[in-house]
Swiss-Prot record:
Cofactor note: May bind 1 zinc ion per subunit.
Gene designation per UniProt: secA
Functional note: Part of the Sec protein translocase complex. Interacts with the SecYEG preprotein conducting channel. Has a central role in coupling the hydrolysis of ATP to the transfer of proteins into and across the cell membrane, serving both as a receptor for the preprotein-SecB complex and as an ATP-driven molecular motor driving the stepwise translocation of polypeptide chains across the membrane.
GO biological process terms on file: intracellular protein transmembrane transport; protein import; protein targeting; protein transport by the Sec complex
Protein's recorded name: Protein translocase subunit SecA
Residue ranges of the region described as Disordered: 881-915
EC number assigned by the record: 7.4.2.8
A Pfam family assignment: P-loop_SecA
Subunit description: Monomer and homodimer. Part of the essential Sec protein translocation apparatus which comprises SecA, SecYEG and auxiliary proteins SecDF-YajC and YidC.
Organism: Azotobacter vinelandii (strain DJ / ATCC BAA-1303)
Transmembrane regions listed in the UniProt entry: none
Length: 915
């Protein structure tokens, strides 16, 4: 009740933040004349001066006004661009580790230079993260002259880059790259066999462009490095032949069955489930195909792999549609990003789903893969000491940014007032009527000379609109995943008078649509541009620009609402950049997916009550509000899914950090002899304890069993029974010490033959290999645990707590296995003299061969989320998560302190065992 009044009196939190920063803007502006008076050399020398002051104890916050003033002056001299006051505010928001929401055309790329320059002064590296390689290269090349003028180095990381180039790019003061490449390089670094093979420094500061796309849209997509698993392509083909015989079971909300079938589809959660008739029928089909023994059960433990194939086939046929979720190009299935409409090169769905789609489309089936290393963007970006982001649309997701990443959103005022008109939605009864109205609107804009951008949700929709326009003889350009090579060129000219451009969702994001077209692109197309043709191109563009402004600017037409309001706002934001005129309108129908699945029956009943006729539309604020309510419902569901993914992956993330910390410690250690000796003592103690229980009588000892274990696990034959027969006083502890001494003697003999240095190198490489192999197997086991854990809910158990408990037990077992396997390999190895340098080179060649066989994937979101319906997710108590700040360096934990994992054990007996 009082909130609106208080907001009027004191302003919103956002207003107060902006007001606070305007004081700093005045301080920066006061320095402008002083900076103008400096020569280029004096301005460049400021960078070294700032670094010196940092070394003497000044902070980046204290340097900010002067550093921003220097960056602004350098921008004017090098690029002819002066940072506006609101852009200075944007730079401060980024420096403070927050998200700056800036409208389209407000110069986000230029804003980033302020915070990037200031934070690069510390010499710890700054990463600028973009959504694709084109934008990474474009922005780096665009801003490179500014940074180099100020004495800073710039690098770009790209896929398939030679190692030397990539290492140099990461060593630069400022590194541009995509979220995928930064994430994969982090995983690669944690598979390296020497420190020299690593690329990244400590993760210091990152500025994420289009932060909503990366931290929200991509959050449920794990990054996976995988190797090839066993080939089961024939099984995919056999299952694929059976799936079309299954029918969908359809039941209306009132419980009336309209079609008897074998499986049920939940369109809201994109889940598919075989019913009782389906289980019986598929078992009969599998038995007749010779894939399931007669009388056997599909749910038997030894048939679970077969069940996985059946569900993969079902999902491929029912939930994945060609030209909607994927396209076929050559002999490949390329996934389409639902948020951008772009193809996702190199990404493959996990759990056999990609292979099932290949079988469905009759394409060569690529081998399955096994996870070697994985993480999520949520956990990767929380490793940075400081994180910031920019986007045109973040405010609708402010709660999630705060909750998951500890990032506040600050809405930056526009340099010029927004002149765009956003019309109410027009809702039609059928899609046919809706598309007819869209064509009518396009025709009207063409007669006025206005450019039109038509946004569609899928390739299928964009091609349907294209066909309708062809019938009407209207010239147009289509921009979707099939034609993404032309993306920048098409978007650059989408603002010409009367131009019609059809784009899937946010294809072309990152490139502004300039009214009248882009004259710079025309100049770039000239072979030998001279002043005269360039001047003519500029003059022609000025006429077109004025013509489009007088006609009303760019008109954005959306053919349907997206599940997220943010994506709709991004589409609207293509019009009306930098105070230009423009307009937007959404055309909807009751047959659209969002309306059909999520919009309330109230809207449908309301429209029917009006007695609407064919071709008529309803335009009412109540309808628009009802649709936004449906979108908020979907956004809430998607947030819950992302939050749940994070809660499950946080368990794996703690284990990942322990393993990667151990790996790095191994790489940094010159001598791990003491670690190996400690492992040997522990492994031997466990082996003796199994055969000679503590405080037991000699009659209870299994001496023969212990002799066999010593030979199989430690590679030594010791006459234990003879020792005991010869010495009546040989008690348990003395026997243990005598066995250990015998093992040490045998190991020292190997050390004398191989040489101490060579053996230390060999120990390190063996331990790294054992760790990597067992970690890979552990990831697979964790996947299996995660996929079935939701079933514990039926036993009145909390799936999350069960997952934490069992994964901790698995991790304890992993730690023991690492020690045991490393000692077993080192005990059995046959030693011969070899140059340590040759050995290391051989191992490096093997690692490179492995890297060539690796696949870098974005798995389906379900690879990290448990397989569960929404009801299963609600077994646990709903408690809001506290905000999670970006990860800072953790304080050192004492060996006798309680382990932070919550096991109740001392740190040295738990996660500290391997440190």
């Amino acid at each position: 009740m009082f909130a609106p009044l208080l907001r009027v009196l004191f302003g919103s939190k956002n207003d107060r933040e902006v007001k606070r920063m305007r004081r700093a803007v005045r301080a920066i502006n006061a320095l402008e004349e002083q900076m103008v008076a400096l020569t280029d050399e004096q301005l460049r020398a400021k960078t070294e001066e700032f670094r010196g002051r940092l070394g003497k104890g000044e902070t980046l916050d204290q340097l900010l006004p002067e550093a921003f003033a220097v960056a602004r002056e350098a921008g004017k001299r090098v690029m002819g661009m002066r940072h506006f006051d609101v852009q200075l505010i944007g730079g401060m928001v980024l420096h403070e580790g927050k998200i700056a929401e800036m409208r389209t055309g407000e110069g986000k790329t230029l804003v980033a230079t302020l915070a990037v320059y200031l934070n690069a002064l510390a010499g710890k590296g700054v990463h600028v993260v973009t959504v694709n390689d084109y934008l990474a290269r474009r922005d780096a090349n665009w801003m490179r002259p500014l940074y180099e003028f100020l004495g800073l180095s710039v690098g770009v990381v790209t896929p398939f880059q030679p190692p030397e180039e990539k290492r140099a790019a990461y060593a630069a003061d400022i590194t541009y790259g995509t979220n995928n490449e930064f994430g994969f390089d982090y995983l690669r670094d944690n598979m390296a066999f020497s420190l020299e093979d690593k690329f990244q420094r400590e993760l210091n500061y990152a500025v994420i462009d289009e932060v909503d796309s990366i931290l929200i849209d991509e959050a449920r997509t794990p990054l996976i490095i995988s190797g090839q698993a066993e080939d089961s392509s024939q099984l995919y083909l056999q299952i694929n032949a059976l799936i079309p015989r299954l029918k969908r079971h359809i039941e209306e909300e009132e419980g009336v069955v309209t079609q008897e079938g074998h499986y049920v589809v939940d369109e809201k959660t994109r889940q598919i489930e075989l019913n009782e008739q389906g289980h019986q029928f598929i078992e009969e089909l599998l038995a007749s195909a010779g894939l399931l023994p007669e009388g056997d059960n599909l749910y038997s433990a030894h048939n679970l792999q077969l069940l996985t194939h059946v569900y993969a086939g079902l999902r491929a046929h029912v939930l994945f549609h060609r030209n909607v979720e994927y396209i076929v190009q050559g002999n490949q299935v390329l996934l389409i990003d639902e948020h951008t409409g772009r193809t996702m090169q190199g990404r493959r769905l996990s759990e056999g789903l990609h292979q099932a789609i290949e079988a469905k489309e009759g394409l060569p089936i690529q081998a399955e893969s096994q996870t070697l290393a994985s993480t999520t963007f949520q956990n990767y970006f929380r490793l940075y000491h400081k994180l910031a982001g920019m986007t045109g649309t973040a405010d609708t997701e402010a709660f999630e940014f705060r909750q998951i990443y500890g990032l506040d959103v600050v809405v930056i005022p526009t340099h010029r007032p927004i002149a765009r008109k956003d019309f109410n939605d027009l809702v039609y009864l059928t899609q046919e009527e809706k598309y007819a109205a869209i064509i009518g609107d396009i025709k009207e804009c063409q007669t006025q000379g206005r450019p039109v951008l038509v946004g569609t949700a899928s390739i299928e929709s964009s091609e349907y609109v294209s066909q309708l326009l062809k019938k009407e003889g209207i010239a147009h350009q289509v921009l979707n995943a099939k034609y993404h090579e032309k993306e920048a060129e098409i978007i650059a000219q989408a603002g010409r008078p009367g131009a019609v451009t059809i784009a899937t969702n946010m294809a072309g994001r990152g490139t502004d649509i300039l009214l009248g077209g882009n004259w710079e692109v025309e100049v770039a197309a000239l072979e030998n541009p001279t002043d005269e043709p360039v001047a003519q191109i500029k003059a022609d563009w000025q006429k077109r620009h004025q013509q489009v402004i007088e006609a009303g600017g760019l008109h954005v037409i959306a053919s349907e609402r997206h599940e997220s309001r943010r994506i709709d706002n991004q589409l609207r934001g293509r019009a009306g950049r930098q105070g230009d005129p423009g307009s937007s309108r959404f055309y909807l129908s009751l047959e659209d997916n969002l309306m059909r699945i999520f919009a309330s029956d109230r809207v449908k009943n309301f429209m029917k009550a009006l007695g609407m006729q064919a071709g008529e539309a309803i335009e009412h604020r109540m309808v628009t509000n009802a649709i936004e309510k449906a979108q908020r419902k979907v956004e809430g569901r998607n947030f819950d899914m992302r939050k749940q993914l994070l809660e499950f992956d946080d368990v794996a993330n703690e284990q990942r950090k322990v393993i990667y910390h151990m790996r790095n410690s191994l790489l940094e250690s010159e001598d791990i002899g003491e670690t190996i000796a400690e492992f040997r003592r522990e492994v031997l103690g466990a082996a003796i304890g199994q055969h000679i229980p503590p405080q037991s009588l000699p009659e209870q000892w299994d001496v023969a069993g212990l002799e066999a274990v010593l030979q199989s696990d430690f590679g030594v034959q010791l006459p234990l029974q003879q020792w005991l027969d010869e010495d009546d006083r040989l008690h348990e502890e003395a026997l243990r010490e005598r066995i250990l001494e015998a093992l040490l003697v045998a190991y020292r003999e190997k050390e004398e033959i191989a040489g101490t240095e060579a053996l230390r190198t060999f120990e390190k490489q063996i331990l790294l290999r054992v760790l990597d192999d067992l970690w890979k197997d552990h990831l697979l086991t964790m996947d299996h645990l995660r996929h079935g854990i939701h079933l514990r809910g039926y036993a009145q158990k909390n799936p999350k707590q069960e997952y934490k408990r069992e994964s901790f037990e698995l991790f304890q077992s992993l730690l023991e296995s690492i020690k045991r396997d490393a000692i077993r390999v080192l005990s059995h190895v046959q030693v011969r003299r070899e140059d340590p340098a040759e050995e290391e080179e051989r191992l490096r060649r093997e690692a490179e061969a492995l890297a060539r066989r690796m696949q870098f994937q974005h798995a389906a979101a379900s690879a990290l989320a448990p397989q569960a319906e929404e009801d299963d997710l609600e077994v646990v108590e709903e408690v809001p998560l506290p905000g999670t700040a970006p990860v800072r360096p953790e304080p050192k934990i004492g060996r006798n302190e309680p382990c932070p994992c919550g096991s109740g054990k001392k740190y040295k007996h738990c996660h500290g065992q391997l440190n």
